[in-house]
């Protein structure tokens, strides 16, 4: 009966002021949708790698190198020999697995007549399926990777190569720069979940690798995972490892460094900082935290909006509450009525919010590059968190308006004088201050995020990226070197091709090949790691690298195969104070018997995006270290139709490598993909900032409307007494602009401090300028002015006689 009475009251109030109810519910729904969408994304990001039953005890072994107390290198990868040596010599390691990626990123995979270029290929030992719970649809978890020349493939790959046939027992041929190997399919696994940092299409048995590689300590090209008997063992193992490493440092390379490890918890890998040689781009922890605060701010703004509008409207309901109290209604019953009304309003808003999320989720997934569903709500505590937020929202938005009315005596409520309460007015002003403080912080932050993105895009990269077509090398074939040179010359003759060069890496990616080098005549042999870029003599000119001292490679010099060109960072790492000092110096390069001579220094350029710092790079002739493979042909295009050039190169390709797929990309687009994460963050911040301002202004608009309604007669009297229109406008507006100005004064230092800390993560960043804060202030005041003016003008320009008849 009580619930029925509550429902009747709620329905009557909803229908009585439909416009008001729509604004209230819509503002709440938009705020909920925004916050829940962000919370869904956050839940997904925090769910990474938690699907494994032993995830809390699994750690990734990451390599660290120190010179004294200085950390010089920090990698996600580790040596091939770390896993077995750690289990044999260090206490607390129950099990381990290694995932080796020594071979080139792409290989040719053949089954019958079908031959395709594939990536996502790795070498895993039997421990892989002991540590990780990836679902194996076919095959035995204990033995599918136990012998040489075995391979486990994903369900998608099985359909791709074998259609409806049973793939188990079939033979796949893998062709890489280390030769051909035939592997028997011993298992089929389900696609690795999107919320896993591990994604492979082919897992070859670790025993397939050459024997010398399997326990080699001087190749840090494996991802090693250990299962600890207790998380408390982590620090103990990290402390003991440097002493263990001394037993295995038998070669000259990196002998002067302290070899260490950092055990990174599996569940934290995705949101911890991006390290060198990560398999995938990780999440951005600072951006996630910023989005959490943004979502909470939007939710608070929506709740405050609801409270302010409900309290503002309570002047109409004061007599209703007064009558109920006079006829015997208990305070608890009245609070229950308001809470029930808040429950209904929040429930309607929640349902609308779910509908909005369902509509927006596909576009949102495309923006953030994820595959997110509502299923994340049902993992661990996230579903409970959403429910708790819903309950808190009901309490906040229902309890305060009820208490605001119950504090007044029934006689005051029956007289309808509730609106004159100074304490209630002050409370609403405080809530407006909170709303606009949050909106102002979001607005300043969004502007600075876009300013940083613009800064990174406007800066000179020091390397050419536009008008360059990049073609991936084919899989290893007979007479590869001769064919590639013939094809390069053929492409160079095309009318739309300006320059053609071959290299082991292109701008936008890690060079990914590094060697431990030092000055040849350095008695201390201070080895440091340098990225080694294999290229032909045309590379420096084609990519527009600036030679600041010396010269680049040239076919005119017959001995350039034994020369090096280094960048400025490499020169400093070698200890040269002046770039000129490096010219003619000899460098001892790891794996080479004879030193190489420096013939030139190029200006530092951005091999990767500006969210990463400069690294020491050594460019060497492609014929010098042949085990470091060539991977790309870069074609600098002349003005014209790119598709025509692609078509012409495709024809040339088929003349030489008909069995390999012709894969290409445009370098500027490939380079820009590095900024997608930052751009997505900027778009999200911008979108939610706009919503926060919209909701705040929506609430302000209704508050002004009610204020004008209450003060209509007062304004009429002021007009009769000679007040000007500007004076009337001032009287009506000052009560709203003072809280907004206070909010701005609070928000500015908070925004400056938080965004200064955010920018500190970028090695190349914009400076905080005054207009980053002045422009949001002007925008906020202008939007607020228009919101207030829209309502107050009606009262200011109304006739006094009409105003005096009001009420």
Where are the language model's segments positioned?
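Intracellular coupling helices
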Residues: 5-23, 27, 302-345, 407-418, ...
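Small-residue-rich transmembrane alpha-helices
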Residues: 33, 37-40, 262, 266, ...
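C-terminal transmembrane helical bundles of large multi-pass transporters
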Residues: 658-745, 755, 760, 797
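Hydrophobic alpha-helical transmembrane segments of multi-pass inner-membrane transport and secretion
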Residues: 16-44, 282-319, 347, 427-452, ...
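Membrane-proximal extracellular/periplasmic loop immediately following the first transmembrane helix
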Residues: 38-105, 219-225, 238-240, 260-271, ...
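Membrane-helix entry/capping segments
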Residues: 1-12, 16-20, 52, 242-295, ...
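Alpha-helical transmembrane segments
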Residues: 30-59, 360-369, 438-466, 483, ...
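Mid-to-C-terminal secondary-structure elements
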Residues: 125-137, 149-283, 486-677
């Amino acid at each position: 009966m009580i619930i029925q009475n509550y429902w009747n009251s709620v329905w009557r109030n909803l229908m009585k002021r439909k416009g008001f109810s729509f604004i209230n519910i819509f503002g709440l729904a938009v705020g909920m949708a925004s916050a829940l969408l962000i919370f869904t994304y956050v839940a997904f990001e925090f769910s990474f790698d938690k699907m494994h039953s032993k995830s809390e005890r699994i750690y990734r072994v990451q390599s660290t190198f120190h010179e004294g107390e200085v950390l010089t290198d920090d990698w996600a990868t580790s040596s091939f020999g770390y896993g077995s040596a750690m289990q044999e010599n260090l206490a607390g390691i129950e099990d381990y697995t290694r995932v080796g990626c020594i071979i080139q990123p792409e290989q040719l995979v053949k089954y019958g007549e079908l031959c395709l270029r594939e990536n996502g290929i790795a070498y895993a030992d039997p421990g892989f399926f002991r540590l990780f719970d990836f679902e194996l649809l076919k095959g035995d978890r204990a033995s599918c990777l136990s012998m040489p020349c075995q391979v486990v493939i994903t369900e998608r790959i099985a359909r791709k190569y074998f259609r409806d046939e049973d793939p188990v027992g079939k033979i796949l041929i893998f062709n890489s720069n280390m030769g051909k190997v035939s592997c028997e399919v011993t298992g089929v696994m389900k696609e690795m979940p999107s919320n896993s940092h591990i994604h492979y299409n082919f897992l070859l048995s670790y025993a397939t690798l050459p024997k010398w590689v399997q326990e080699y300590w001087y190749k840090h090209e494996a991802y090693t995972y250990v299962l600890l008997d207790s998380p408390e063992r982590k620090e103990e193992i990290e402390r003991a490892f440097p002493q263990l490493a001394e037993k295995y440092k038998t070669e000259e390379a990196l002998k002067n460094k302290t070899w260490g490890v950092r055990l990174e918890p599996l569940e934290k890998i995705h949101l911890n900082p991006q390290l060198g040689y990560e398999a995938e781009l990780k999440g951005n922890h600072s951006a996630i935290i910023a989005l959490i605060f943004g979502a909470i701010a939007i939710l608070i703004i929506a709740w405050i909006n609801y409270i302010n509008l409900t309290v503002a409207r309570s002047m109409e309901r004061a007599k209703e509450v007064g009558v109920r109290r006079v006829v015997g209604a208990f305070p608890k019953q009245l609070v229950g009525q308001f809470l029930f009304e808040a429950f209904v309003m929040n429930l309607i808003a929640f349902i609308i919010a779910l509908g909005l999320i369902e509509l927006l989720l596909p576009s949102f997934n495309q923006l953030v590059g994820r595959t997110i569903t509502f299923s994340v709500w049902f993992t661990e505590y996230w579903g409970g968190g959403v429910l708790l937020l819903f309950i808190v929202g009901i309490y906040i938005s229902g309890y305060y308006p009820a208490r605001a009315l119950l504090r007044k005596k029934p006689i005051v409520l029956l007289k309808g004088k509730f609106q004159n309460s100074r304490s209630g007015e002050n409370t609403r002003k405080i809530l407006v201050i909170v709303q606009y403080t949050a909106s102002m912080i979001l607005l300043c932050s969004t502007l600075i995020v876009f300013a940083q993105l613009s800064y990174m895009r406007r800066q000179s990269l020091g390397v050419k990226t536009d008008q360059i077509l990049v073609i991936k090398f084919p899989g290893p074939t007979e007479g590869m070197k001769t064919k590639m040179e013939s094809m390069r010359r053929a492409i160079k003759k095309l009318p739309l091709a300006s320059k053609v060069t071959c290299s082991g890496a292109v701008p936008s990616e890690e060079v990914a090949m590094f060697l431990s080098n030092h000055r040849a005549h350095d008695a201390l042999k201070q080895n440091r790691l340098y990225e080694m870029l294999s290229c032909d003599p045309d590379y420096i000119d084609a990519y527009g690298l600036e030679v600041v001292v010396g010269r680049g490679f040239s076919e005119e010099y017959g001995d350039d195969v034994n020369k090096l060109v280094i960048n400025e960072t490499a020169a400093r790492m070698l200890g040269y104070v002046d770039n000129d000092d490096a010219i003619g110096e000899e460098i001892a390069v790891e794996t080479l018997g004879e030193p190489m001579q420096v013939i030139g220094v190029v200006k530092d350029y951005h091999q990767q995006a500006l969210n990463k710092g400069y690294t020491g790079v050594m460019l060497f002739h492609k014929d010098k270290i042949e085990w470091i493979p060539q991977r790309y042909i870069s074609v600098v295009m002349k003005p014209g139709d790119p598709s025509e050039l692609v078509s012409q190169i495709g024809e040339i390709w088929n003349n030489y490598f008909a069995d390999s797929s012709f894969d290409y990309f445009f370098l500027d687009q490939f380079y820009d993909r590095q900024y997608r994460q930052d751009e997505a963050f900027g778009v999200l911040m911008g979108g939610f900032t706009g919503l926060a301002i919209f909701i705040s202004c929506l609430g302000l608009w209704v508050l002004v409307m009610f204020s004008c309604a209450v003060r209509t007669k007062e304004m009429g009297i002021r007009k009769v007494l000679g007040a000007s229109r500007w004076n009337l406008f001032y009287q009506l507006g000052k009560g709203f602009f003072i809280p907004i100005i206070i909010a701005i004064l609070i928000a500015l230092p908070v925004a400056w401090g938080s965004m200064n800390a955010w920018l500190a993560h970028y090695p190349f960043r914009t400076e905080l300028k005054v207009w980053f804060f002045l422009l949001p202030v002007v925008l906020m005041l202008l939007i607020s002015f228009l919101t207030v003016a829209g309502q107050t003008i009606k009262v200011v320009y109304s006739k006094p006689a009409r105003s005096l008849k009001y009420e």
